[in-house]
């Protein structure tokens, strides 16, 4: 085999693996978050709106107005216009981005691994089943773009530093990749610490003074990008985190200690999803998730995993620098979405493990290279068989898993099968049933969700609103009352609550609740509340209605 073919063969192999795992999505619809973010979002349906996307939130205002991701929303706009709103182009872009990201991971790994180890890393990344939530979902384009940009940036940095030739054009290229990634999704902020981890592990030879001198221009550029990003984002959103915390964190008024304890309960599951996913789900919520109420023995395995990761990362730094860097990659990439620093809008989400999993496959590539170079022949054969089985199993699981993202009906049925004990699975399935007019199924699913976890005020508000629209005043009023007990300062749904009370003839309650709601309701509802108070006073005074 010529040298050119030897270089091309891994690229073709990896591209085919990535295609095999994603090509079946080409006929899928807009599913789950795709619908509010793309399909129902008029802001991404016209090219004339493109400039304004850089001053608007990612999620539409009616869905909370969270996030700031103008690059990916701009990309959605171009795709929508080009395909006249058809989903096939969005999924084609997903497929192409998935292939490009796999090749970028391989190219990045080649910067510090021989070709065989890098090929193993790229192949395992191509067939990793936990990636399906990203590759099968249109909104996963944000994760794909970030991983693509950051893998290229790390690979370029390591190559240029190894050659002792980090020039101005390299600084510009890496900074541009960072800026694009950061404007695509906020977790791209991990690039600077990732490069520092590379300096501490796979980049050898320079003393710390030399490193500071060489890296100063790059990190000054990073600082400028981050400050500019925070300034513009601050004009759009006031909250630094950018998203409302997960309902369990928010409505239970969970302390930081209990939030960390909850994540320690989740850490074994997260480690398994990254290293060897045996069970996948699009949602992880109570009671599938164990909520911490103070220190508990159940948190010890998660604590052990965290401590062991740090200890191994330090211990392997000299003996196995690539493995050490892989552990650092997992840690750094996962930290912003871990709920350990700040609460996020989820407890565990498979899409957030896409970029951290690069570190896991780098470790696997380092192990494969070590076995190829140092193990006995019998052990090498055994490892080759195990790798082949792992690739086949991963690809088969990935292809099978892609089916659940075909459309919303398929997705929500699969969600119930995957997370039968999760309250959000039943809540979301109830919402889907309501959209199709299946009211008996809707009520059954809503009641099941509330029995599992009644402290999600957003969910109980939604159910109360559904009851109101169906004319079921008594159960609606009961749920509104519960909702405002959980979230007493909420202004949403106050008028609907007062309306239900009026329908039930509870005029004393109408007057009390309308007056109590005045500090919380939006300005447009103040007049309605005052009218309700006046009507209650008239009825209670003996007037006819």
What do these predicted regions represent?
Residues 471, 503-512, 534-545:
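Alpha-helical linker/edge segments of TPR/alpha-solenoid repeat scaffolds
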Residues 499-502, 507-524:
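TPR/TPR-like (Sel1-like) alpha-helical repeat modules
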Residues 420, 454, 488, 522-523:
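Short coil turns that delineate tetratricopeptide repeat
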Residues 496-499, 528:
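Alpha-helical, heptad-rich or low-complexity scaffold/stalk segments
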Residues 417, 448-451, 481-485, 519:
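Conserved structural position within tetratricopeptide repeats
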Residues 1-458, 465-469, 473, 496, ...:
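Polytopic membrane enzymes that build or remodel cell-surface glycoconjugates and lipids
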Residues 530-532:
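Extended amphipathic alpha-helical coiled-coil/heptad-repeat regions
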């Amino acid at each position: 085999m010529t040298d050119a073919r030897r270089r091309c063969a891994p690229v073709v192999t990896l591209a085919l693996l990535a295609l095999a795992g994603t090509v079946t999505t080409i006929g899928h619809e807009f599913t789950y978050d795709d619908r509010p973010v793309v399909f129902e979002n008029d802001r991404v349906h016209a090219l004339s709106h493109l400039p304004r996307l850089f001053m608007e939130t990612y999620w539409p205002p009616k869905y909370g107005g969270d996030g700031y991701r103008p690059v990916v929303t701009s990309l959605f706009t171009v795709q929508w216009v080009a395909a006249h709103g058809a989903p096939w182009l969005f999924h084609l872009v997903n497929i192409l981005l998935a292939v490009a990201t796999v090749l970028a991971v391989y190219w990045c790994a080649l910067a510090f691994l021989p070709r065989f180890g890098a090929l193993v890393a790229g192949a395992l990344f191509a067939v990793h089943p936990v990636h399906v939530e990203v590759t099968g979902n249109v909104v996963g384009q944000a994760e794909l773009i970030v991983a693509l940009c950051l893998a290229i940036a790390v690979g370029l940095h390591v190559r240029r530093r190894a050659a002792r030739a980090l020039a101005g054009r390299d600084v510009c290229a890496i900074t541009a990749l960072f800026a694009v990634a950061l404007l695509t999704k906020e977790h791209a902020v991990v690039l600077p610490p990732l490069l520092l981890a590379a300096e501490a592990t796979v980049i050898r030879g320079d003393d710390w003074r030399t490193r500071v001198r060489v890296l100063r221009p790059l990190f000054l550029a990073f600082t400028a990008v981050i400050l500019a990003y925070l300034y513009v984002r601050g004009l759009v959103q006031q909250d630094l985190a950018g998203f409302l915390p997960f309902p369990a964190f928010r409505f239970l008024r969970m302390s930081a200690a209990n939030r960390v304890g909850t994540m320690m309960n989740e850490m074994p599951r997260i480690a398994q999803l990254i290293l060897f996913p045996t069970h996948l789900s699009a949602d992880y919520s109570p009671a599938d998730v164990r909520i911490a109420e103070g220190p508990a023995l159940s948190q010890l395995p998660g604590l052990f995993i965290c401590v062991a990761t740090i200890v191994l990362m330090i211990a392997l730094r000299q003996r196995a620098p690539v493995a050490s860097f892989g552990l650092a990659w997992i840690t750094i990439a996962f930290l912003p979405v871990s709920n350990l620093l700040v609460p996020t809008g989820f407890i565990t989400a498979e899409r957030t493990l896409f970029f951290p999993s690069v570190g896991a496959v780098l470790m696997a590539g380092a192990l494969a290279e070590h076995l190829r170079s140092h193990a006995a022949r019998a052990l090498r054969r055994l490892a080759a068989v195990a790798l082949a089985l792992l690739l086949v199993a991963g690809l088969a699981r990935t292809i099978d898993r892609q089916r659940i993202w075909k459309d919303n009906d398929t997705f929500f049925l699969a969600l119930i099968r995957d997370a039968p004990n999760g309250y959000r699975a039943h809540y979301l399935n109830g919402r889907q049933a309501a959209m199709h007019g299946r009211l008996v199924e809707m009520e059954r699913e809503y009641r099941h969700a509330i029995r599992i976890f009644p402290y999600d005020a957003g969910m109980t508000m939604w159910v109360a609103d559904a009851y109101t629209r169906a004319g079921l005043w008594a159960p609606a009023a009961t749920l509104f009352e519960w909702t405002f007990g959980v979230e007493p300062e909420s202004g949403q749904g106050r008028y609907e609550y007062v309306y239900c009370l009026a329908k039930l003839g509870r005029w004393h309650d109408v007057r009390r609740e309308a007056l109590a709601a005045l500090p919380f309701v939006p300005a447009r509802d103040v007049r309605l509340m005052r009218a309700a108070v006046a009507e209650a006073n008239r009825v209670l005074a003996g007037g006819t209605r």
